[in-house]
């Protein structure tokens, strides 16, 4: 008799077992030594509370609800919210977005699954720049696709030759995540423009458009006065996905959107397919309460200086210890090179010092490890001596 769980999902669970094992060990250390004695830099969970403007808007929505506020709503989202998002995007990109180009989703993860459901046939390929957000593998597999990795340089910037080599006649989409998880790098406009030219040529060569999916949940978490270039003006076949988990501190509320570039080939047809996907994947619609919230809190954001200060609090000491690390320009991650080639062994050595980080192998880049600085300053200060001890122990 075969097992009750589908073989494909069993395989996915096996591939994700390193995550489960890591968090099991973290829980054991906290239970044994006390949470206050463990430096947990493993989780990308936004630590900052929502801005006061968000809390005030929520109070208003809850205390003075409009009639019918909790009924079913359109699968694509509330029309007035979609129009608000479209106007915001038009202001940023100078492209003629309308409400019809917007599907409000259950976070960026929901938006990615909606997009891939609408795009992929069995056997199609999705290329992403490596290192990459670990869930991309599973999202592609959800819809019969296969994730293909295109390596980046030592600075984690786009390698156009590697990207071109990764594209085949089965390539349906390329996912770009900037600012990037796990590296924190921002891809500059000139690189993105060159990528667009490459994808236009590849689309012509293979006879169908390759869609560029811009995954941008960290767009508003950038440092040093930098900005994130808009991708849709650079490549017509772009889908923009994002969420308000990070900039508004609403990770648990699952509110984001998919924006279809107005000049996308068969844009109206794709929008209809995305709405259908949102429905039949079981999302149905994003939470109505938090949809209504968005236009009420335009311009609100968590204080990004908090994350920048923690980045700086880590960066200089780690380099002085001997760690090699590219300066993150956004998000809340560092992705140092492991002092030893085996990043998993390094992470285990760190656990012996009650220090929790994530092996780079899980992000497709062995020999590195990820630090999340979405923590308190006290956790950072407690972690630094442990980083130094581990570096000395492994012979870095």
Where are these regions (language model features)?
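N-terminal small-domain helix-loop-helix segment of the aminotransferase-like
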Residues: 2-107, 114, 290, 297-304, ...
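Conserved core segment of the aminotransferase class I/II
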Residues: 236-308, 312
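Alpha-helix termini
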Residues: 28-34, 92-94, 198-209, 262-268, ...
